[in-house]
Structures are given as structure tokens and as C-alpha cells.
Amino acid sequence: YMQFYTNVSILKNDVYYRGVDENGKRVQKKIPYQPHLFIPVKEKTKFKTLDGRYVEKIRQETIYEAKDFIQKYKDVEGFDIFGNETFIYQFLGDMYPNNINWNKDKIVIWALDIEVASERGFPDPADASEEVQCITVADKSGYKMVFGLGEFKTEDKTIQYIQCKNERELLEQFLEFWIELKPDVVTGWNTSLFDIPYLYRRIAYLFSEPKARQLSPWGYVQEKSVMKYGKKNFAYNLLGISSLDYLDLYKKFTYTSQEKYTLGHISYVEGVGEKINYSEYDNLHTLYKENFQKFIEYNIKDVELVMQLEEKMG
């Protein structure tokens, strides 16, 4: 095996490293990192800048110290500091001086989709006031783990269904599974602005912030606000997990403009399949109340469509 990383983040003075080692085993470690910088010198050295000036390598004790050093001299005339100030790249350059050979089979990728009560219109992650009724996660082999609040029957061997007696149990069961799973990558459709913030804020609301932070393998979550359609949205970076939102990726890497970017429309346009039609019911909430079986099938199908898009788009 060649070792490779799946996620590297910097927090304070440490590098939070997740990856696969040379034995093919998964590793997760916190590494205190000492970055280096280059300062110009008069005499000849073995390091030169792109424009031919000689520089000397100075190692900093900590990331804080390096940032402090840069800050201190940034306005000093004639004192230029060189080096890779984005210390993540410097760390990766030190750790992997040659090419990295990723083994895709060793990267744990899960697609996620949640359904939330919608009796009072479309649920808003900002207040996360409606209950989570169903969560489906699927891996790239097609295996699906489904957590729901009612009875669901299936002959499908690729589906494991966990029936929960209430929402608190559903979220606890899901969290336990998630912690054991330790995903490297989470994907889905609009997951970065809906599913992940909703789950985070709902768990924090029903239990506590520390419990919600367990969504990150490091127990650390960064909140940021994103303006979209003139409205403030919350997004959460779950430290240690890379988030690949297929809605964002699709907009970024396809060159055709679509009339709408719903999962149903894009799946249809790309020819991977169609969402489950529940037009015989007024809305999703009625479907949930009157035909729970179909409600769960609808949720599972959404996750399958995301995985099929992933396969098609690569």
C-alpha cells in the first residue's frame, strides 16, 4: 500500500490528520507542526527565490509563531518573507514529497439525505424546529442504512432499516452509526446548506452542542454564514470530513444552464432516473402520515439518484 491522506485541517498549532497508512489501515492523529519560512540573505545559500535571490530557511517553533513572524515584518521595507504561508500545503509537501497515490476503495464516501416534518411549509435549518423523520445514508457499493419513525418492509438486501420509537432515538442511533463509520467524505444534494446544518442544529437543540459536535470525528465544528438568494444560511465544517455537495459540484462543473437545479430535474436531464412520484398526495407531509412505506422509499430513491449521478459524473 501507498499511504495517503483523506483530510488534513489545521487548528491552532496542530495539524489534524486523517488518512490511510502503508499497511492500508486508517489513521487519525493530531500532529504539532513546525512550519518554515525563508528570509533573504546576502551570502549564497542552497535556496533561491523564483527571481534569483538567495534566502535562508528558518524553522518556526509553532504555527502561531510563524504567523506572528509574518505579521511582524509584513510592512518592513526590503524584508520579504517567502515560503508557503498556507501551512497545510507546506505540511503536505513535507509529508508527501512525491506524488500521492490515492486508493479510492479505501476512502469512505457516504451520501446523505434527511426528511424533515413539513407541516408548516419548507423547514428552515436556522431554527431547526421541525422533527427529523427519516435519515438515509448510502455508500458507493449501494448499501443503504435507513433510520425512520415507523414501520417499513423491504425484501431488498442492500437496505438495512432501523425503526426508531421517536426522533431522539432516531438521532442517537444515527449518531452512533456515524461515529463508528468515520466517513472521509459526505455527499448529497444541497447537503451543505440543508441536511448537515439541519442535523447539527437539531441535535444541538434536542440534546446539546457537544453532542452535535460528534458529527465531526475530531469533535470540532466550525460555523459560517453564507448568503444565498438574499438570505443568511448556516453552513458547518465538520472537521475531518470533506463535504462534497453535488448541487454545488454540478453547477460548477457542467457548462449548461438548467431551468432548475432540483435533484429530480437534474437526474431526469442526466438520464439516471426519476424521483418517486407521490402526486396522489397533497404534499410530502400527507405522504408521511398516510403512506409511510412510500415515504421511506422516496427518501431512499433520492440517495440512490445522488449516487447514480456521482457514478455518471465521476
What kind of region is each of these model predictions?
Residues Y1-L247, Y255-G314:
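The two-metal-ion catalytic cores of nucleic-acid processing enzymes
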Residues K251:
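Periplasmic solute-binding protein
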